[in-house]
Design a protein with these regions (language model features):
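Non-heme Fe(II)-dependent double-stranded beta-helix
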Residues: 1-13, 20-113, 119-121, 236
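Non-heme Fe(II)/2-oxoglutarate
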Residues: 34, 45-53, 158, 198-200, ...
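Active-site region of the double-stranded beta-helix
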Residues: 90-91, 117, 133-143, 148-150
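Generic beta-strand structural signal
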Residues: 91-93, 97-98, 109-111, 126-132, ...
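Feature marks short, surface-exposed loop/turn motifs that line or immediately flank catalytic pockets
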Residues: 104, 138, 152, 207, ...
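A short beta-loop-beta micro-motif enriched in histidine and acidic residues
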Residues: 115-127, 186, 193, 214-215
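Short, conserved beta-strand element in jelly-roll/cupin
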Residues: 121-138, 192, 200, 222-225
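Double-stranded beta-helix
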Residues: 139-205
Length: 267
């Protein structure tokens, strides 16, 4: 799978692009089966990210690719590794982690505006996340982005339900602006999506999502380019990689079995 040149240009400019019809139906079916298996047998890392009184439910799970055969096949056979390398401008695309996000119909819990990279244990500019729905997603329930925000500074990561600074110390990074207070002032991107569509975004692009008007099963897979290095934190990252610092020192390339190279494919 290869991209038209203007797609990579738009990604570099806006920090988010839609890849319409990027996946063949067989890959969507494979991924859907993997998500359903994951929901039926969640890993110890799974969590409910909605409040107990929410009429729906928001479930997340992380780092399941080595335990879920459908996820593994999807990551290595879907062609997204090559797309990642092209978007990043990197000769290689290395898996960082997978992330399953399912909002059941009627879920009220929004995903507040945030950047992803401040929650992580990596430094570097070459990165991309793919947001892959296996159900139709309305524009109102889809992920949305502030175009160009990936070119700005890191902003304070906070917990989604109580806005606590559980990662970087309070005051060490600037807080996010109140985008919802004046949405018209911001260049917001978002798209209605069908199974087979993929959204690609940079880990520093500000993004959010509303609740779900119908069931919304999504798989997100995140890739790192050649400039990515390990950045151990003094706090648990999200997701966390316990013990990794003993094997991968600060500043080292992310060359570790947890993060295999997906593109180019091994011969």
């Amino acid at each position: 799978m290869s991209l038209a040149g203007d797609v990579a240009r738009d990604f570099r400019r806006d920090g988010a692009v839609r890849l319409r019809g990027a996946l063949v139906p067989q890959m969507v079916d494979l991924l859907r089966s993997g998500i359903d298996e994951n929901l039926a047998r969640p890993s110890p890392r799974a969590k409910t990210a909605s409040r107990p009184d929410d009429p729906g439910r928001f479930v997340e799970d992380f780092c399941c690719w080595d335990e879920n055969p459908a996820y593994r096949r999807f990551i290595f056979e879907s062609g997204l590794g090559q797309v990642a390398a092209e978007l990043m401008g990197s000769p290689t695309a290395r898996l960082y982690h997978d992330h399953m996000l399912t909002k059941e119909a009627g879920t009220l819990q929004p995903t507040p505006w945030h950047q992803d990279q401040p929650y992580y244990n990596v430094e570097g500019r070459q990165n991309v996340s793919f947001w892959v729905p296996v159900d139709p997603v309305s524009r109102a329930a889809s992920l949305e982005f502030v175009a160009g925000s990936h070119l700005g500074p890191w902003l304070m990561p906070r917990s989604f339900m109580d806005a606590q600074a559980k990662w970087f110390p309070e005051g060490s990074l600037a807080d996010l602006p109140d985008i919802e207070a004046d949405r018209a002032a911001w260049p917001i991107l978002g798209w209605a999506l069908e199974p087979g569509d993929v959204v690609a975004f940079h880990m520093l692009t500000l993004h959010s999502a509303a609740g779900a008007d119908r069931r919304r099963r999504v798989f997100s897979v995140r890739f790192l380019g050649e400039d990515a290095t390990h950045a151990p934190r003094a706090w648990p990252t999200s997701p966390d990689f316990p013990g990794l610092e003993a094997e991968l020192p600060a500043g080292a390339p992310m060359d570790h079995p947890l993060f295999p190279v997906v593109w180019p494919a091994a011969s």
